[in-house]
Amino acid sequence: YLRHMAIDFRSDTVTRPVPAMLQAMMQAKLGDDVFGEDPTVNFLEEKIADMFGMEAAVFCPSGTMTNQIAIKCHTQPGDEVICDELSHIYQYEGGGIAFNSGCSVKLLKGDLGRIAAAQIKYAVNNRNDAHRAYSKLVSLENTSNRGGGSCYHFKSFAAIRKACDDHELKLH
């Protein structure tokens, strides 16, 4: 059966719950998460915070919202975000970087959505040049969109992390 089953990864919005999922939703304990009264959201946020050794976590209902909040937290208006030219934050988030954070974007040509650590030092703007945006954040993703499901190797992440540290860049 599974050999012939197609799995649609185009978007998280194309999925449909099976009857057991619908039943679980009907029986779930509910509350207002804004007031800290939703036990399911509270449990999820506590579990994720513990997993990552953080004081707290915030549940976001979409990847786009999560990305835009992270970018806003890491940047100031006028800063620059460095990312691959195929990245979701550039291609599919409605200009959110400019609209929500007031930042410009520097696009790098990577390999199926993956940039290399060596590209970062050449992408960073001169911090003493008042005519250029302040390079502040590098954004990475394991893309299932235009990169066709390509994933970074952990060693690549580590090398990019070091390049970001070397150039005082935040990493998302």
Locate predicted features.
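Glycine-rich loop at the start of a catalytic domain that most often binds anionic cofactors/ligands
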Residues: 51, 70-78, 96
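Hydrophobic beta-strand scaffold residues
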Residues: 81, 104-105, 164, 171-172
